[in-house]
Amino acid sequence: MYQRFWYKFYDAKVSSYYFQFYAISARRKKTIVSAICLLATSAFLLQMSQNTTNHLVWIVLVISSQLVALFQPLFPYEKQYHAACYIYEDVNQLCSEMEAYWRTIGAETSDEEINQKIILFSDKQDKIENRFATADLFPQSQRMHAKAVKNADYYFRGLN
């Protein structure tokens, strides 16, 4: 039972890192699109002020870049960012609870008690992930998962 609990704890920590990296990636995408819209609008306005012809073309380009900035909250990475932040915070709290319980497990702890905790923590993790995210909101990213596994390994090396 100790081994099963340890694997569940490890899985929760990997999940925590995974959603942390997803939030970072989504925030990066958000920043990049905002910067592109800002630079495009500035460049178009500068060009429009210097060019006396084709004002309509420059006005359309400025408006289109502003529309992209306006509809940016509707892009999927905006939802990913907010959902990943909430999931990360809650799963990280769950990992803290699991770590506190791991430190209390001793030889006198029964397998039944450990099994109940495994079920309890699994249910909590499922509820956290299902509450904030739909299945299609977070497409699998092998790169982020590998990075999360690597960071979890570093974390658990320091825990022992």
What are these regions (language model features)?
Residues 52-64:
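Hydrophobic alpha-helical transmembrane segments
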Residues 40-54:
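Juxtamembrane "helix exit" motif at the C-terminal ends of alpha-helical transmembrane segments
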